[in-house]
Amino acid sequence: MLVIPINLVGTKYPLCVNCHRQIRLTTNAGADFAGAKTVASPALGDRLRPDMIITPKIRGFICTTAHPEGCAQHVAEQIAIVKNRGLIENGPKKVLVIGSSTGYGLSSRIAAAFGANAATIGVFFERPSENGRTATAGWYNSAAFEKEAAAAGLYARSFNGDAFSDPVKAEVIAAIKADLGKVDLVIYSLASPRRTEPKTGEVYKSVLKPIGESYTNKNLNTTTGVVNEITIEPAEGDDIEQTTAVMGGADWQLWMDALLEADVLAEGVQTVSYSYIGPEVTWPIYKNGTIGRAKEDLENVQRALDTQLAPLNGKAWVSVNKALVTQASSAIPVVPLYISLLYKVMKAEGSHEDTIEQMDRLLRDRLYSGSPQPDNAGRIRVDDWEMTPQVQETVGKNWDEVSTENLSQLADFDGYQTSFLRLFGFGLSSVDYASETEPDVAIPSLS
């Protein structure tokens, strides 16, 4: 039985007592309810539905709301891009994506499913709608993906839980054994501020700090559009070790060990995790900072995994991807200004890609083309268009000159903001944001 406490005083539609939102209560047949302070429905098939108008609410680098129809449309647009490029020849057939609900992980799942007709299992940690709050964007993305996959006749199953934990690993392995037998591609795309070590229970927390000395440079306040200066104090204590424990390769190794032990990796299996290098202006806070140390650990694990997978004729890769607006990148100081400048230059020359174009190119032109084109360190580089001398020279010149006053001329800040809002399902032209929508959306395989 669903019970919703409401207050009917002085409103066209009642107010939810819990969240104070204006809501419209309807049955599946569409009839309005009114005249009672508490309404109960005896059957889920005719349950009350609190529709509401959902708007973006931004706090710092996070949007605390998400729009279900907008997220679904964003997923649909990514699918269309992949399908328009045709089938990936000799692509993966059974894919596990660890961290599959947003950003590069979501686009990886879409590219595999709709570019190669792959069966996919996705793992993520997202929050459903509850108590008048919207679900997270990743929840809506995953619901939309599963519905689109079902319509296309593709297997898709999702697991919502702590991917760092042993129980989630065990559940996923059981599903692979039962439904797929073995997987031929494992994508590791987790970004998290903390990780609980499954054996000891110790909680590690990551930090974004330079190493050795403080770092001062230009920064963009993405709320106000002001270009100012920011100083970030250096790592101290065990910051480096903590960050490496969260963002390094330890959990990737644990996943691959568990999958190998369970004998659910196919002959010729490939696994890939993601990294970023970027230009020198970002190195103190990224490549040479605490997160950079974690990525060094990731590359060490990649080399170890490559050896472990050799008996299966398998390969492990680190893919260095382009700087893009994602929920993870928006949290890194300095990087949003760089991305805004980069977007301006790459869009002007016609080389701009978003996450879906990046992941489609990774699968289509690198992992499954027979020509992965690794660099001298063995990494796959799909940041290659970003890092061309022509692009970097122009971005570097504009970095030196950019200020609050000329931001709109030198940078694509509007594009940055648009991309940020789209992550949460806002700003898509085909969605009517003035209409009420149902925030409670189910993920089919979790229902």
Q: PLM features: residue spans?
A:
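Rossmann-fold scaffold of SDR-type NAD(P)-dependent oxidoreductases
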Residues: 98, 183-191, 270-275
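Glycine-rich phosphate-binding loop and adjoining beta1-alpha1-beta2 segment
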Residues: 117-155
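A glycine-rich helix->loop->beta "capping" turn
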Residues: 171-200
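NAD(P)H-dependent oxidoreductase Rossmann-fold/reductase module
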Residues: 52-76, 150, 281-297, 301-447
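Cysteine-centered motifs
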Residues: 16-19
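Canonical Rossmann dinucleotide-binding motif of NAD(H)/NADP(H)-dependent dehydrogenases/reductases
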Residues: 90-124
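Conserved NAD(P)H cofactor-binding loop of Rossmann-fold oxidoreductase domains
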Residues: 161, 189-198, 215-224
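Catalytic loop of short-chain dehydrogenase/reductase
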Residues: 206-313, 320-343
